[in-house]
A protein has these predicted regions:
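Phosphate- and other anionic-substrate recognition elements at nucleic-acid/protein interfaces
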Residues: 1-100, 107-108
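Short, conserved catalytic/metal-binding motifs centered on acidic residues
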Residues: 18, 38, 42, 80, ...
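Short alpha-helical scaffolding segments that buttress acidic/His motifs in well-ordered protein cores
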Residues: 45, 70, 149, 196-201, ...
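Helix-hairpin-helix/helix-loop-helix acidic hairpins
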Residues: 88-144, 153, 205-208
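Phosphate-backbone recognition surface of nucleic-acid-processing proteins
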Residues: 143, 149-221, 225
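Acidic, carboxylate-rich catalytic segments that either coordinate divalent cations
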Residues: 206-251
Length: 251
C-alpha cells in the first residue's frame, strides 16, 4: 500500500490486483521462466487489465488524510474489542480466584473502547460532511459500523452492487462442472467489513422491518440460518451502497 500511494501521488495510474489473478495469469503464459520474464509479467497483466472495458479492478485512489486517520482509529478499536471478546470467553474457564482479574481487564477494555468510540464519532462528524449519517438512517447500522464501512470499504457508493458485495466477500460464487452443480459459496473479501455487517444485520433483523421480512423469507423456505443472514448482509450492503451513491450524486 505505501508503494501504491507513492506511485499514485506521482501521477501514475495504479491498480492493486488480486494475487490469485496475477498468479493464474503468470501460469497461463509460456513455460519459460527467467528473472527478466518475471519482471515483465506485472506490466503485461496491467496492460491486459487496462484494455478491458468492464475491468473488475477499480483504479487505486489513495485515501485522504482524514480517511487514513479514520482507518487507524477503526483498526485500533478492533484490537481491544477482540481482546475483550477473548477475555469474556476466558471468564467461564478460569479458576474462581482469577475471575476478578479477568473482570478488571474486561472493564479496562470497555473504557478504552468507549474512548475510541468517542474519537471515531468526533472525527467522522468533523471531517466527512454528513457522509457518516447516510448509512445510519438504516436501523441496525450504527456509528461504528458506518465508520468501518467508510474506512475499510472506501469504494462504497462508487461500484455496482455486485462488485461491492464481492469486495466484502458476501457474493455467492457458482461452482459447476459438467452436469454437476455444487452449492454456491462466498469466500475472500475484507473480513473487517464482513464482521461489521454481520453485527449490523443481527440488529437489523430485529428493528428494521425490510430486513426482518427479508430474513424470514429464506428461513420459511427451509434454508439454513447462515444463508439467510448472508443474504441480509448483502441486502444491507446494497442499500448502503445505493444511498452512498445518491449522496455522491447530490454532493
Amino acid at each position: 500500500i505505501p508503494a501504491a500511494k507513492a506511485i499514485r501521488r506521482a501521477g501514475i495510474a495504479v491498480i492493486i490486483a488480486n494475487p490469485r489473478q496475477t498468479h493464474q495469469f503468470a501460469q497461463s503464459q509460456p513455460l519459460t521462466k527467467t528473472d527478466a520474464k518475471d519482471a515483465k509479467m506485472p506490466a503485461f497483466f496491467a496492460q491486459m487489465t487496462a484494455q478491458k472495458e468492464d475491468s473488475q479492478t477499480m483504479p487505486y485512489q489513495p485515501p485522504t488524510e482524514a480517511e487514513e486517520v479514520l482507518e487507524a482509529l477503526v483498526n485500533r478499536r478492533n484490537q481491544p474489542a477482540d481482546m475483550r471478546t477473548a477475555e469474556k470467553n476466558r471468564l467461564h474457564q478460569v479458576h474462581e480466584t482469577q475471575v476478578g482479574s479477568v473482570k478488571q481487564l474486561i472493564a479496562h477494555f470497555d473504557r478504552l473502547i468507549d474512548e475510541l468510540d468517542k474519537q471515531i464519532d468526533n472525527h467522522t462528524h468533523t471531517h466527512f460532511d454528513g457522509k457518516d449519517q447516510v448509512a445510519e438512517q438504516i436501523k441496525g447500522i450504527g456509528s461504528i459500523t458506518t465508520a468501518t464501512l467508510m474506512a475499510m470499504l472506501p469504494e462504497l457508493g462508487r461500484l455496482s452492487h455486485k462488485r461491492i458485495a464481492g469486495l466484502a466477500g458476501i457474493a455467492p460464487h457458482p461452482r459447476e462442472g459438467g452436469e454437476t452443480k455444487f452449492k454456491s459459496r462466498c469466500f475472500g473479501g475484507r473480513s473487517a467489513v464482513r464482521k461489521a455487517l454481520y453485527m449490523a444485520t443481527v440488529a437489523a433483523t430485529r428493528f428494521e422491518p425490510l430486513i426482518r421480512d427479508f430474513h424470514q423469507r429464506p428461513l420459511s423456505e427451509g434454508k439454513p440460518y447462515k444463508v439467510a443472514v448472508t443474504a441480509c448482509m448483502r441486502k444491507l450492503l446494497t442499500i448502503s451502497n445505493a444511498r452512498m451513491r445518491d449522496y455522491f450524486a447530490e454532493n
